[in-house]
């Protein structure tokens, strides 16, 4: 599958601040008649949004320690990247070459993007922002690494300091990032994580997504948070029922 097709497939991982369309041409939003409560009624392709039993995001609590969980192997590299305001979020499309290995499977990094506030919560508390690093295996499986971010007045995020000056403010605009971008700069020192099986967090809400959420949060400055929220005041989906799913925690 070519990269543009992958990007369309994964568009549901982003969210919108005003009514936008998916690759099916169907509008969806986070408020009003196009909002989450009606997603499943907007298009037959969105049915999982209403009836799916493995939906994301979820509240992370009572995670069970599983000492057998393997570390996530990161093989990220610096390279050219393009930033786009896709009408859902600010998305960075990365050059080929960065990937993770998890449970013996290689997942190539396709893109990363942001949600404000975070989609997922920890014991009922949302974070100020989250970056979702979206990966795809050779056989089409999706794995998303989530890094929660918390506002810290005196500590800007180094990678955001590189990215934000190029941030496109108008839907459809793209910008080449002048510096090389290494997504590894987002990763916390402590690689402990939570994991569960979920879905894309927006239409079509496709299930079977492997979620890997770091337990350690990373900082961003108030100014960095405001710069994003000025474009997307809210682009996150309400929490979904676990329906008996278990959340596991690594050591």
Where are each of the predicted segments found?
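Alpha-carbonic anhydrase
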Residues: 2-251
